[in-house]
């Protein structure tokens, strides 16, 4: 039985006041909600503050990136050991914005995946196709390639306890979203692709949907059998909007 996870990716947003106010709002909005895991990934500057603000709540701490190195002369980077030390659990890797703006390759992302696993942290591996790739009918090819960077080097066992986030690049922050049927088809493909190596592991992998998820489309998305929650961008910056998505995930999986 997979439990859904809804994770908020705050991206490059926030300040000290916002961290306190947003988390206070989440604590209120999510009171009594169960059946769905919740995590937030603030900017690294605010991880310590967020950790204290979520203390005693069901909200887990995440982060938006990690370096492949654990220490050394790597200016500006943050290591898996540092993230673990500060209390982060879910670490986003491979986000399309990192792939685009920082030219992160599939191989580099696979190395980050391995470092997180070795450190005992949970990778949230983002995969997904661009609009051009989607229009060219290459969605499955792209997703398979991005998964295979890990699968072919670390094996199916590496996906135990891991989160995959399918984020069609054309839907991120655009207001566009894949239809529930479109998203389900890709999620099923991802699960089936891993199942070729190990069906048991594939059955328990959490596969989130990301790409303009909001309180209006969440329930229909989460009703799909292979959609296990969401990686949420803009809507995660508002307590009521984010909580509505969490509640939709919890309700859908109880139905």
Curated annotation (Swiss-Prot):
GO terms for biological process, alphabetical: gluconeogenesis; glyceraldehyde-3-phosphate biosynthetic process; glycerol catabolic process; glycolytic process
Record carries keyword Cytoplasm: yes
Localization (cell): Cytoplasm
Pathway in which this enzyme or protein is active: Carbohydrate biosynthesis; gluconeogenesis; Carbohydrate degradation; glycolysis; D-glyceraldehyde 3-phosphate from glycerone phosphate: step 1/1
Cited Gene3D superfamilies: Aldolase class I
Presence of the UniProt keyword Ion transport in the record: no
E.C. number: 5.3.1.1
SUPFAM superfamilies: Triosephosphate isomerase (TIM)
HAMAP family: TIM_B
Family named by the database record: Belongs to the triosephosphate isomerase family.
Subunit: Homodimer.
GO molecular function: triose-phosphate isomerase activity
GO cellular component: cytosol
Predominant subcellular localization, coarse grouping: cytoplasm
Name the UniProt record assigns to this protein: Triosephosphate isomerase
Binding site for substrate: 9-11, 173, 212, 233-234
Pfam families: TIM (PF00121)
Physiological role: Involved in the gluconeogenesis. Catalyzes stereospecifically the conversion of dihydroxyacetone phosphate (DHAP) to D-glyceraldehyde-3-phosphate (G3P).
Catalytic residues (UniProt): 95, 167
Keywords: Cytoplasm, Gluconeogenesis, Glycolysis, Isomerase
InterPro entries, sorted: Aldolase_TIM (IPR013785), TIM_sf (IPR035990), TrioseP_Isoase_bac/euk (IPR022896), Triosephosphate_isomerase (IPR000652), Triosephosphate_isomerase_AS (IPR020861)
Organism: Erwinia tasmaniensis (strain DSM 17950 / CFBP 7177 / CIP 109463 / NCPPB 4357 / Et1/99)
Catalysed reaction, written as an equation: D-glyceraldehyde 3-phosphate = dihydroxyacetone phosphate
């Amino acid at each position: 039985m997979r439990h859904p996870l809804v994770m908020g990716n705050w991206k490059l947003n926030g300040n000290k006041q916002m961290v306190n106010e947003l988390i206070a709002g989440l604590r209120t909005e999510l009171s009594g909600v169960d059946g769905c895991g919740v995590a937030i990934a603030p900017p690294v500057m605010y991880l310590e503050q967020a950790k204290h603000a979520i203390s005693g709540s069901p909200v887990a701490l995440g982060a938006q990136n990690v370096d492949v190195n654990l220490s050394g002369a790597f200016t500006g980077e943050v290591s898996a050991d540092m993230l673990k030390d500060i209390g982060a659990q879910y670490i986003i890797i491979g986000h399309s914005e990192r792939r685009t703006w920082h030219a992160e390759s599939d191989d580099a992302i696979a190395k980050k995946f391995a470092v997180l696993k070795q450190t005992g942290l949970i990778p949230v591996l983002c995969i997904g196709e661009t609009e051009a790739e989607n229009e060219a009918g290459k969605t499955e090819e792209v997703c398979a390639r991005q998964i295979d960077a890990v699968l072919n080097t670390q094996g199916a066992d590496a996906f135990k306890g891991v989160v995959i986030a399918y984020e069609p690049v054309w839907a991120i922050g655009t207001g566009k979203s894949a239809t529930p049927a479109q998203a389900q088809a890709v999620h099923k493909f991802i699960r089936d692709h891993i199942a070729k190596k190990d069906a048991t592991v594939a059955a328990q992998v959490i596969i989130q949907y990301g790409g303009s998820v909001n309180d209006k489309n969440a329930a229909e998305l989460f009703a799909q059998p292979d959609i296990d929650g969401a990686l949420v961008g803009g809507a995660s910056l508002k307590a009521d909007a984010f909580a509505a998505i969490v509640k939709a995930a919890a309700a859908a999986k109880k139905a």
